[in-house]
């Protein structure tokens, strides 16, 4: 049986995975807005990918989820700061058996999403991908494995996650079931707080960060603090997680930067509250010091709504 899929947020992540699904013949509707929506309607969606090559597919796209009948799967890919508002408008897409798979930055978006659509509909997800909107209607994938990690939020395995894994795999998206998806979510969170936070803070790509002992020490310190907060809140992140994070950073192209870096340079809103700001808040709650993350948060907070006006 072919899944009916809606992609809420057709940016880098949603656009890439939705495009792969559409190329495989899945029934996909993209929820988008502005020039990106207009370009997709007029010319289709173009994917330029190191993994999947370059292709263009005609797509169904709308800015109104109310025009889309209930679906089997919602890929929920909006920016973290839009989570609650976007969750409210996808209600028409939710049927009795609908799964909602969030592929977002941050570690508290699952709870905010579940509070609106119902926890019974939400499974945990992690997107192992680096991709951006290169131009309206065009998604550029530049790094990452193109893989999705998924699992029940409460842990363990289930028939529905196994079926979702199979459906994604059949469409050409590698998917792996994680028995404790919260650990996987935190592992990515720890990495991007460092990688994204420090490339944004310095306005420099990762190669320049790693070439400086002082800057790479800052990168490591941010990740170590986030890992300490994870453990203090009961998340069993691996002991070698920060070392693996540093090794992963070194495997990126030297010109690469994180999502905060790209959004900052484009004058867009920043997910700073969902990233380093969350480390600071949770650290305060569990009496875990986070001075490195506070410095990143404090320096970038004036840009949270875009370029500040003097």
Cite the ranges covered by each PLM segment.
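N-terminal glycine-rich dinucleotide-binding loop that anchors FAD/FMN and/or NAD(P) in oxidoreductases
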Residues: 45-61, 192
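Rossmann-like NAD(P)(H) cofactor-binding subdomain of soluble oxidoreductases
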Residues: 54-138
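NAD(P)-dependent Rossmann-like dehydrogenase/reductase catalytic/cofactor-binding core
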Residues: 2, 169, 218-310
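Nucleotide donor/acceptor-binding cores
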Residues: 3-4, 72, 146
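NAD(P)+-binding Rossmann beta1-loop-alpha1 motif at the extreme N-terminus of oxidoreductases
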Residues: 1-49
């Amino acid at each position: 049986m072919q899944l009916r899929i809606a992609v809420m947020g057709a940016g880098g992540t949603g656009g890439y995975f939705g495009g792969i699904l559409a190329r495989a013949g899945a029934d996909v509707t993209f929820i988008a807005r502005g020039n990106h929506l207009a370009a997709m309607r007029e010319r289709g969606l173009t994917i330029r990918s190191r993994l999947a090559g370059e292709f263009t597919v005609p797509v169904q796209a709308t800015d109104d989820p109310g025009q889309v009948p209930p679906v089997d799967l919602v890929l929920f890919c909006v920016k973290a700061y839009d989570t609650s508002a976007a969750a409210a408008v996808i209600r028409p897409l939710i049927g009795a058996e609908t799964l909602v798979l969030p592929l977002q930055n941050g570690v508290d978006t699952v709870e905010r999403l579940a509070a609106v659509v119902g926890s019974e509909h939400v499974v945990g997800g992690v997107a192992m991908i680096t991709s951006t909107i290169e131009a309206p209607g065009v998604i550029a994938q530049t790094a990452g494995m193109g893989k999705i990690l998924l699992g029940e939020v409460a842990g363990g395995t289930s028939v529905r996650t196994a079926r979702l894994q199979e459906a994604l795999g059949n469409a050409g998206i590698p998917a792996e079931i994680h028995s404790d998806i919260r650990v996987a979510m935190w592992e990515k969170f720890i990495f991007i707080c460092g990688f994204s936070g420090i490339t944004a803070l310095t306005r420099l790509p990762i190669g320049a960060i790693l070439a400086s002992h002082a800057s790479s020490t800052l990168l490591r310190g941010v990740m170590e603090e986030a890992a300490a907060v994870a453990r203090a809140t009961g998340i069993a992140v691996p002991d070698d997680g920060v070392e693996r994070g540093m090794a992963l950073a070194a495997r990126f192209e030297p010109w690469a930067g994180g999502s905060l870096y790209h959004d900052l340079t484009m004058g867009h809103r920043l997910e700073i509250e969902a990233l380093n700001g969350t480390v600071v808040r949770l650290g305060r709650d569990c009496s875990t010091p986070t001075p490195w993350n506070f410095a990143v948060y404090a320096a970038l907070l004036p840009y949270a709504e875009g370029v500040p006006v003097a």
